[in-house]
């Protein structure tokens, strides 16, 4: 029987209030069907409410942001659907900001990883206003997602969010991420990756040039997941709010096959849960994203992927083995 967490949360003003935003947005990449409905139908929100005793604040909708999609959205700087992704993430940023400003822990269920432009920008702004400090981002993913538009081979914006969020990519057009202001951004020094194993050449160069802390699967194989998480948290520092952005493709396809860009040689589900548990234990978590669950891909593995996603969220929000 699961019981609520006893870990004191340092940066959450409203105790067990959990702001939830469900986002069925797929336009940052080519595969439709990236949607959190399977997670919700599997009982994830009920588990968080009944077992972990969260006071859930959710509007009951899965937001697609279809009403914000422009009639014409030609490529810009190589980006595909830039106005669509910009409009959706700007709206999501406002939603996350409202929850975080009220002092709630925020959970966003995606959606492809382009939505992090919205979630992280909203959390960063709220934390600056409410606490007067910068937050850190722990990005758990097979991919670095820090391509600048001109460096991207695909043009898919789900491979670019961290370039915009760190200010390494900018655009002056309001309808193409020009709405991002300094208080929406994070410092590259406050970004840590875990689980990388498919990183583009230009991204490797950016990581080196800007001294961004990154732990690949090589590091996990060498040191073990426990030591890697220790080093990641030490880099961030003890008194720093944490936004955890978890792409389910960080897990090996054995555990999460129903995702758009699976890469073999990834985390086990237990390693993924350990990362989430360890971040919860710090008491510093202020927001979490779970993204790239797509039950329409590898349909035979859809239930396995959904179970894995639910486990990662529960672990980050205080579920324990004992």
From Swiss-Prot:
Keyword Manganese among record annotations: yes
Pfam families: Arginase
Swiss-Prot/TrEMBL catalytic activity: L-arginine + H2O = urea + L-ornithine
One GO CC annotation: nucleus
Protein residues bound to Mn(2+) 2: 141, 143, 247, 249
Residues given in the record as substrate binding sites: 143-147, 154-156, 200, 261, 292
Cofactor binding remark: Binds 2 manganese ions per subunit.
BP GO terms, sorted: arginine catabolic process to ornithine; urea cycle
Molecular function (Gene Ontology), one example: arginase activity
Keywords: Arginine metabolism, Hydrolase, Manganese, Metal-binding
Keyword Nucleotide-binding: no
Pathways per UniProt: Nitrogen metabolism; urea cycle; L-ornithine and urea from L-arginine: step 1/1
Enzyme class: hydrolase
Residues holding Mn(2+) 1: 113, 141, 145, 247
Cofactor (UniProt): Mn(2+)
Documented EC number(s): 3.5.3.1
Subunit structure: Homotrimer.
Family: Belongs to the arginase family.
Protein name as it appears in the record: Arginase
Source organism of this protein record: Coccidioides posadasii (strain C735)
